[in-house]
Amino acid sequence: MAKMNAIGIVETKGFAPLIQGADAAIKAASVDMVEWRQVGSGYVSFVIEGDVAAVRSAVDAGVEAASRVGEVISELVIPRPIDELDQTFDR
């Protein structure tokens, strides 16, 4: 299993802000999409990975874009996450 440099998570209320945010995040920096998932009660999130600076830049761009069309619930960047965290994602 490859070691992740950093992961970024953006959670939104509704699918349209998720798509807008994920699109902007992927275009803003050299990051890879790990997954998106329905959290429940209309909340959805996407997870990206890459180096720490790229993930931070991508999350910032994603939050800005998503907030233009809907509500951003939370955002998170984790540098050097533990290996076991990778097992929680649907790859």
Region annotations inferred by a language model:
Residues M1-R91:
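Terminal helix-to-tail segments of small alpha-helical proteins
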